Swiss-Prot record:
PANTHER family: FUMARYLACETOACETATE HYDROLASE DOMAIN-CONTAINING PROTEIN 2A, FUMARYLACETOACETATE HYDROLASE DOMAIN-CONTAINING PROTEIN 2A-RELATED. It comes from Burkholderia cenocepacia (strain ATCC BAA-245 / DSM 16553 / LMG 16656 / NCTC 13227 / J2315 / CF5610) (Burkholderia cepacia (strain J2315)). It is an enzyme of class 3 (hydrolase). This is Putative hydrolase BceJ2315_61450. Keywords: Hydrolase, Magnesium, Metal-binding. GO terms for biological process: urate catabolic process. The keyword Metal-binding applies. Gene3D superfamilies: Fumarylacetoacetase-like, C-terminal domain.
Length: 282
């Protein structure tokens, strides 16, 4: 299934794409795509509904983040060896974990606000993993059983705040609008191997990132198992799993960063695309 949330910010309704790619309204069946709705049992109930029987959503509504009421938005850094090299950092021996504040979450096509005074706002296309069941101390072999589905994430980052101002990644990762998620939550049954997904990103039509999740340092299963040893993962938590090379700060001979008035387009095979305009934060 391809699940989504549509409507104005803070008023999103749950929906599903039908066979023709049209949005159907799920709000008569579930209040939101959040919490226990994302469990195996909750998704099985949605799967039993014939989308053709649901109300058709007219027009072109705003698409919100594909998960509501996210409890934890967990980032993984330097999870592609070639990205670590372009960043001038060693390949990690254990996952680099940081938090993205949930207030950074926005829809996949909402604008990106460049923070006041920023000259180092950067892009990162990433595979997002949505947890579907409470998860603590799980084995790698069973880790994917706890996944509800997958989505596209742009891990927008302000490099001065991330690296130069005390070295705390959280500070550079959590500005408002720095967490576009979606457009869809694609359930795990439709993604047989999360380590075989092409991902890409363009700025104003120029392709900067081309990668595949097979080159991750730590696989999705390894990340879930690792994180579950130091925290309890809950339904609706989102893990964004790192980016391939091609980010702005790694461009030679001179880094390239986002400016107001640009268009950012990114996507992952089978998971959809995002399109964001950049603007100065007010």
């Amino acid at each position: 299934m391809k699940l989504l949330r549509y409507g104005p910010p803070g008023q999103e309704k749950p929906g599903i794409l039908d066979a023709a790619g049209r949005i159907r309204d799920l709000s008569a069946h579930v209040p939101d795509l959040a919490g226990e709705v994302l469990s195996d049992a909750g998704l099985a109930r949605l799967r039993a509904i014939d989308p053709a029987t649901l109300p058709l959503v007219s027009g072109e509504p705003r698409i919100g983040a594909c998960v509501g009421h996210v409890g934890k938005f967990i980032g993984i850094g330097l999870n592609y060896a070639d990205h670590a090299a372009e960043a001038g950092m060693p390949v990690p021996k254990e996952p680099v974990v940081f938090g993205k504040w949930t207030s950074s979450i926005c829809g996949p096509n909402d604008g990106i606000d460049i923070p006041k005074g920023s000259v180092k706002t950067d892009w990162e296309v990433e595979l997002g993993v949505v947890i579907g069941a409470k998860c603590k101390d799980v084995d790698e072999a069973r880790a994917l059983d706890y996944v509800a589905g997958y989505c596209v994430v742009n891990d927008v980052s302000e490099r001065e705040w991330q690296i130069e101002r005390g070295g705390q990644w959280d500070k550079g990762k959590g500005f408002d609008t720095f967490g576009p998620i979606g457009p869809w939550l694609v359930t795990r049954d439709e993604v047989p191997d999360p380590q075989r997904l092409d991902l890409w990103l363009e700025i104003d039509g120029h392709r900067y990132q081309n990668g595949n999740t097979r080159t991750m340092v730590f696989t999705v299963a390894q990340l879930i198992a690792y994180l579950s040893t130091c925290m309890t993962l809950q339904p609706g938590d989102v893990i964004t799993t790192g980016t391939p090379p091609g980010v702005g700060m790694g461009i030679k001979p001179s880094p390239v960063f986002l400016k107001a008035g640009q268009m950012v387009r990114l996507g992952i095979d089978g998971l959809g695309e995002q399109l964001q305009s950049t603007r100065h934060a007010q």
